[in-house]
Amino acid sequence: NVVYRFGHSMLNETVDRFDPNFNDQSMGLIEAFLNPLAFDASGTLTAEEAAGSIVRGMTRQAGNAIDEFVTDALRDNLLGLPLDLAALNLARGRDAGAPSLNEARASFFAQTGDTRLQEYANWEEFAFNLKNPASIINFLAAYGTHPSITGAATMEEKRDAAILIVMGGAGAPPDAVDFLKGQNGWCAQSSGLKDVDLAIKSVGGKGVPDVIHASLMPWE
């Protein structure tokens, strides 16, 4: 249910195509998706010729990184509608009963004994294993249970609260370090870390070819 979606983060804004003379016939990602007649130029190309133009283009196109980011066309304009593919993927996973990130890691560790697959004990450990360290702000804003986050009314306020927890400074809560380190009353269960979705399509992790790293924030 989750594994195949890693490719969503690799897509970019165009479907590159070249005719046999290498004239550029590229299309925008959403335009190509919504216009199947363009595949064979409304029947003027054979299936082989149409596929060939895509092969010539896509084999020369660099994909986006496998990470927690999704190109704008999929994040803001899926199917030509104001839909977010990343958020839909998270919802599908939950509906299908996909485990959380830590639940999956615990299962993989039990099966393999590989200590690299143990559950994350706290937010600090989780952040250390992110490919993009600054993304911890978004994960905290989405999943963190610190009162300064849960008490915030808007997405911007939640991110501001998360920034204060991570960066410190004036206005930072006195238990910010305890919250991040999972100590003095805070742990993976109580801090919200246990709720981070498993979303392999948006590999947030580094190191192990981590089919068990985390999810994309719907607003990222």
Q: Predicted regions: what is each one?
A:
Residues 1-220:
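Terminal regions of secretory-pathway proteins
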